[in-house]
């Protein structure tokens, strides 16, 4: 098996080996998802190879499965291919999450040369420093890029990586995602969420609040089909990213799928941090009748807050009428 890390700030994952297809109204994009810098994927078929389905790939396109179970196709120029032992070493290092759009600089000072511009959600490997270096570089973190170069990022831009990417080693046809992740963590699928919540938040209420706050960080971001970054994000990209950054990996698209942590609960039992499902759309419930979502509606065109309550000025009747499920990881 081969592996790779996304080596560009925002990589594109296509649902087909080509970038466009014929739709009812003409040519449309085949974009399904995005991979952010430093995130891992399993390479099912190398560029130019033949897939298990018998499809010959273009010479510059690889078939991949992301560490959270999304299958697609990526141009090789957006990937840094690595050996299994290299990826294990990377995942076992001190990884940090880019908590906001930020620059990687050549020096621990604002005058440093800009090496890369990263979006929130990207992953970097923190490099160890001596006590003297840390004091001299106070306020900055020394980081390792996927190509081996070192640079510096402001400490205030970084957060701990709370999720696990190790399912990339065990994912295979016929194995549920929860079981694949549990296999590499030496636990069971039913313990994945409780263990992550206990480790990072100490309890359900704190986790729910954190998921809501992560989603709010994308307020005002434009709607982008298949997007998952501050450059543009779609409905399921918003909800799955909020959960991911809080340590729980849910299904990427706007539906509840068996084998991932989320399951349906009664509407009257909904709590902040639960997901609201509509046909082809998903939102995150914030409490008191309000929810946050990324909507392609012309009046919004991005991440906004709306309401389920008719007397709220943020009420959207069209969505309330077609709400069909509430999803929870608890």
Predicted regions and their residues:
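Low-complexity, Gly/Ser/Thr/Pro-rich intrinsically disordered linker/tail segments
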Residues: 311-330
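Asp-box/WD-like beta-propeller blade repeats and closely related beta-sheet repeat scaffolds
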Residues: 91-130
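...with weaker cross-activation on analogous glycine-rich loops/strands in unrelated enzymes
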Residues: 248-311
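Short alpha-helix capping/helix-loop boundary micro-motifs
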Residues: 21-30, 103-114, 258-267
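Active-site nucleophilic cysteine motif
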Residues: 215, 227-246
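Boundary regions of SH3-family modules and the immediately adjacent low-complexity/disordered segments
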Residues: 1-13, 18-29, 37-51, 56-96, ...
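Short, well-ordered loop/turn sites that connect or cap secondary structure elements
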Residues: 29, 35, 118, 269-270, ...
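Loop/turn positions that initiate beta-strands
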Residues: 38, 50, 118-127, 191, ...
């Amino acid at each position: 098996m081969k592996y790779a890390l996304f080596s560009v700030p925002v990589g594109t994952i296509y649902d087909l080996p080509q970038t466009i297809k014929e739709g009812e109204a003409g040519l449309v994009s085949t974009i399904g998802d995005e991979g952010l810098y430093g995130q891992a994927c399993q390479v099912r078929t190398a560029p130019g190879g033949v897939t298990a389905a018998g499809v010959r790939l273009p010479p510059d396109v690889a078939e991949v499965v992301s560490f959270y179970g999304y299958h697609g196709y990526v141009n090789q120029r957006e990937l840094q291919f690595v050996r299994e032992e290299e990826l294990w070493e990377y995942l076992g290092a001190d990884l940090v999450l880019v908590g906001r759009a930020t620059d990687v600089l050549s020096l621990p000072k604002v005058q440093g040369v800009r090496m890369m511009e990263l979006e929130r959600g990207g992953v970097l490997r923190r490099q160890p420093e001596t006590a003297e270096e840390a004091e001299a570089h106070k306020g900055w973190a020394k980081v390792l890029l996927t190509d081996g170069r070192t640079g510096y990022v402001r400490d205030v831009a970084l957060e701990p990586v709370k999720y696990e990417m190790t399912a990339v080693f065990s994912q295979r046809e016929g194995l549920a995602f929860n079981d694949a992740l549990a296999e590499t963590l030496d636990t069971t699928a039913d313990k994945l969420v409780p263990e992550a919540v206990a480790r990072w938040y100490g309890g359900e209420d704190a986790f729910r609040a954190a998921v809501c706050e992560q989603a709010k960080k994308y307020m005002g971001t434009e709607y982008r089909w298949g997007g998952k970054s501050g450059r543009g994000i779609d409905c399921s990209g918003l909800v799955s990213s909020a959960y991911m950054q809080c340590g729980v990996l849910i299904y990427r698209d706007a539906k509840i799928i068996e084998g991932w942590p989320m399951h349906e609960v009664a509407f009257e039992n909904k709590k902040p941090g639960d997901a609201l499902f509509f046909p082809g759309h998903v939102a995150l419930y914030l409490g008191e009748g309000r929810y946050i979502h990324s909507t392609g509606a012309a009046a919004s065109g991005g991440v906004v807050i709306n309401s389920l309550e008719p007397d709220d000025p943020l009420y959207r009747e069209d969505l309330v009428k077609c709400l069909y499920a509430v999803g929870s990881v608890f």
